Amino acid sequence: MTTATGRIALFIPSFSDGGVEKQMVALAGGFAQAGYPTDFLTRPGELPYLDRLDPAVQLIRLPAARNAQREATIDYLRTQRPLVLMSAKGKDDLLALDARDAAKNAAGGTRVFLRCGIHLSSRPKMVSRNPLRGLWHRWRLRRLYARPDGVICVSDGVADDLAQLTGFARARIAVIRNPTISAGFDARLAEPLDDPWFAPGAPPVILGAGSLAPVKHFEVLIEAAAALMRTRELRLVILGEGKERARLEALAGSLGIRDRVRLPGFVGNVLPWMRRAAVFVLSSEREGSPNVVTEALACGTPVVATDCPSGPREILDGGRFGPLIPIGDAAAMQRAIAAVLDAPLPAATLQSAIAEYTLPRACAGYLRAFGLAG
């Protein structure tokens, strides 16, 4: 029987512009620098963050069409025979497992790992008003998670939720923190930011970042900021793009703060913005392990976050490194932001919160989970 090589393949054909993509690019470089041949399988096109991919990583472009991606992945497994194929996003999990099964005889033992970065039971389809719809999705998840060789989660809360929802044994789930602090972090942090709102002497800036989607609840952040602006000279910047843009801009206008709110769109490097912000605010209704929170802390920037399932509480150590507030509560958010602005924690204290979120620690954890290191 043909044996698999020591090659690691990161599988992300649904690549977009989120935090998962940044983390996987960093991990690929970490594996390659640790001496493991590493492939990065993704879709065609001009994609963000790929300029950060380590030159030692082999970038493999899959076709754009989903059916063609399946056939190309099967062919890849048959010819390259990686030891590990890790699916990085839930959209790609079934494709990875089906390709492994179709290529099994020739792949010679490739093992598929699924990486879960979201709190599954909080998704709208899992809490649908139609109980049959929720049961259907739970049944599908249980079938899906009966198939991988291993599962990796980004937080304890995500792992606990996944085990309960799918029946996958909690003891078999590896929890590995995201590699937020990776190669080039300091250089990206030091990049200049030519923006008058962040110039010395300008009013303090409240910062949010993420896709402009309903799940992020940036409308709550705008409402809280508007209340604060009645008595304080402040500005609000929300980085990201999405279908909620028009609604958020209209809300800022209706609250009379349109000239003090900006939505610059997608930004490839958020660190210079975070470094100069007075406070970073996470307003989401659900997160797995929000990279923006760990990035802000790494910059020494105070954080306010919703106590949503499941990452903020773990990162902020139950509120020790930043206030945790109820989801959707603009008044509580207003009070928390005011408290942080009046008495911010020292930067060194905030930075100490993310000691586990480094590329070397993450790589070591993944290699242990893959059975490649002790």
Where are each of the predicted segments found?
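Aromatic "clamp/platform" in nucleotide-sugar-dependent glycosyltransferases that forms part
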Residues: 266, 285
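Short hydrophobic beta-strand element within catalytic cores of glycosyltransferases
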Residues: 302-306
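N-terminal strand-loop element at the rim of the active site
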Residues: 5, 10-18, 22-68, 243
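Conserved acidic donor-binding segment of nucleotide-sugar-dependent glycosyltransferases
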Residues: 317-330, 338-344
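A short, active-site helix/loop in glycosyltransferases that binds the activated sugar's phosphate group
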Residues: 146-175, 180-182
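Short His-centered aromatic/hydrophobic patch
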Residues: 87-93, 116
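A conserved mid-protein helix/loop that constitutes part of the nucleotide-sugar donor-binding site
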Residues: 21-26, 204, 208-227, 243-250
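Nucleotide-sugar donor phosphate/pyrophosphate-binding loop at the beta->alpha transition
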Residues: 68-71, 111, 121-144, 160
